[in-house]
Amino acid sequence: MGTVCESVATAKSSTAVMSSIPPFLSKTYDMVDDPLTDDVVSWSSGNNSFVVWNVPEFAKQFLPKYFKHNNFSSFVRQLNTYGFRKVDPDRWEFANEGFLRGQKQILKSIVRRKPAQVQPPQQPQVQHSSVGACVEVGKFGLEEEVERLQRDKNVLMQELVRLRQQQQVTEHHLQNVGQKVHVMEQRQQQMMSFLAKAVQSPGFLNQFSQQSNEANQHISESNKKRRLPVEDQMNSGSHGVNGLSRQIVRYQSSMNDATNTMLQQIQQMSNAPSHESLSSNNGSFLLGDVPNSNISDNGSSSNGSPEVTLADVSSIPAGFYPAMKYHEPCETNQVMETNLPFSQGDLLPPTQGAAASGSSSSDLVGCETDNGECLDPIMAVLDGALELEADTLNELLPEVQDSFWEQFIGESPVIGETDELISGSVENELILEQLELQSTLSNVWSKNQQMNHLTEQMGLLTSDALRK
């Protein structure tokens, strides 16, 4: 009987204790102590505080179930009124000295605070000490949240500025790409229109292929290497007569065959045995050296032969006679200065002194007729009185294929290539020499009538001398 009474008294006392605990604290304790809610809200490791792990889920599911609302800020303000404080600033962890795990009966020690103006001036000492040790949960939580929001705002502003800069750069690149695409489209349209017109034109393909061939030909001609004349060949070509061999050097022009035949016949006559006594005959004239004893100061021979002056010899055109050397000036050879391709220094007068005994009879050129009169060799050749042979002078005269003539006629430039040839001073000099030589030769052949006239005058002079 007594035991039953004690149990009833204990139940009454527990009921009285439970009735003295505020409903907010009781519901909060039951919610935290429930093991089914540990993933959202649970006790801390020290069992003297609780932690809200998932605030959105906590506000969505548990606040409506226990407190009939879903406002987490309102729940925090309720905790603040009962003296709870936020322990960790990085998470939602709240603590109170009377809120411990397994000690629900001490929740009655937690008293809800009233506003300061309403509170009596005197309060218990224990409550004062507990309030001084705690931190206002609502105030601390709001300030922390404001600071966090400000930090987030700054970060977002920086990110926004960066994104705007990237947007401007991207727009600039996009404009450039659009302009390039527009230009490419215009070029493509121009090309298509050009091709359409070209296909419609019947002579386009022929003209295009012709231009391509001309361009290739021009490139090949510009890359062609031209041979420069050898210095030794230039030196050998500059001398008209070799003093030792007395070989005759001449330029072979377009009338090469006729001139070669005439010179060979003259050489034949000079080598004939019938000309050994020409030194004493009348009307002989010189191509080489003759004895000085046969020639006087006035140009006549010692045995009364007719006068043959240097003017008569030098007036013969260079197109029919080879280059000869002389060392005395002549006053009547001005006509030859403008027509001969060689200088006056290429003529040679008769030698004097002891050279008479050493001179060969082959150096004299003359002829004898049946009546004893001396006939002019040139007139005889032109009149057909003498027969010429064309085998004597082949070794003495250079051929067209010789290197001396290749520098003049081997590679004659085309008129269209004049601009390409004038690329250096050496080439310019060679071209000018070739052009001058060609013009001189053309002038020589244009003076054929004058040469014939001079030849006739020489024949008349010879006849007059014989009459005297």
Curated annotation (Swiss-Prot):
Disulphides: none
The record's function comment reads: Transcriptional activator that specifically binds DNA sequence 5'-AGAAnnTTCT-3' known as heat shock promoter elements (HSE).
Motif range for Nuclear localization signal?
A: 223-227
Residue ranges for the region (Disordered) are 211-244, 268-309
Print the keywords alphabetically: Activator, Cytoplasm, DNA-binding, Nucleus, Phosphoprotein, Stress response, Transcription, Transcription regulation
Instruction: Give me the ranges of the annotated region Hydrophobic repeat HR-A/B.
Output: 133-199
Post-translation changes: Exhibits temperature-dependent phosphorylation.
Full protein name: Heat stress transcription factor A-1e
Sequence motif AHA, residues: 402-411
GO CC annotation terms, alphabetical: cytoplasm; nucleus
Q: Upper taxonomic classification of the species?
A: Eukaryota, Viridiplantae, Streptophyta, Embryophyta, Tracheophyta
Name the PROSITE patterns on file: HSF_DOMAIN
The principal location of this protein is cytoplasm
Tell me the subunit arrangement: Homotrimer.
Q: Which ranges are annotated Low complexity under compositional bias?
A: 277-305
From the UniProt record, list the coiled-coil ranges.
none
Instruction: Write out the annotated subcellular location.
Output: Cytoplasm; Nucleus
Q: Which organism is it from?
A: Arabidopsis thaliana
The free-text domain remark for this protein reads: The hydrophobic-rich region (HR-A/B) corresponds to the oligomerization domain. AHA motif is a transcriptional activator element.
Question: Would you identify the family this protein belongs to, as annotated?
Answer: Belongs to the HSF family. Class A subfamily.
DNA-binding region (UniProt annotation):
21-115
GO MF assignments: DNA-binding transcription factor activity; sequence-specific DNA binding
**Gene this chain is encoded by:** HSFA1E
The Polar residues compositionally biased stretches are: 211-220
Q: Does the keyword DNA-binding apply?
A: yes
Answer yes or no on keyword Transmembrane: no
The short motif Nuclear export signal is annotated over 454-461
